Amino acid sequence: MKLDISLFNSIAQQAKESPRLRMHYDLRDSSEENGQRMLNVLLPGTLENVHRHTNTSEVVICIQGKAIETFYDDNGNITETVEMVAGGECPGVVVEINRWHSIAPVDGPATVITTMAGKYDPESIETL
């Protein structure tokens, strides 16, 4: 499978049709795999809840466009922002276990690859 502009554009079209203005594409062979890896296309205006993962860290790498990962303390105050630029000086971040965070595109659409250990477990995601 090629991860090419045609695939990104197809996912972006689905994101445009989604009220959330984002769409993911599962890169796993099966939902039974003991790990998560996906492409996420984020469009301007998408809102992601501030959240954290209580059972795993998360790797986020921007492969198209620009995105900002924002980190928060337990009271919802911003503690750090990291601009991720595809092909740039800082294309990605590792979000530690239990670290509050959110992501947003900058200056247009952004495509990121996200990976996490373990099967998807909605019980392990908390929102602020």
Predicted regions and their residues:
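Short beta-strand His + acidic residue motifs that chelate non-heme Fe in jelly-roll/DSBH
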Residues: 49-51, 69-71, 92-95, 101-106, ...
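A short, N-terminal "cap"/entry segment at the start of jelly-roll beta-barrel domains
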Residues: 1-35, 81-86
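Glycine- and acidic-residue-biased ligand/ion/polar-headgroup-sensing regions
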Residues: 55-75
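Short acidic-glycine-tyrosine-enriched beta hairpin
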Residues: 73-98
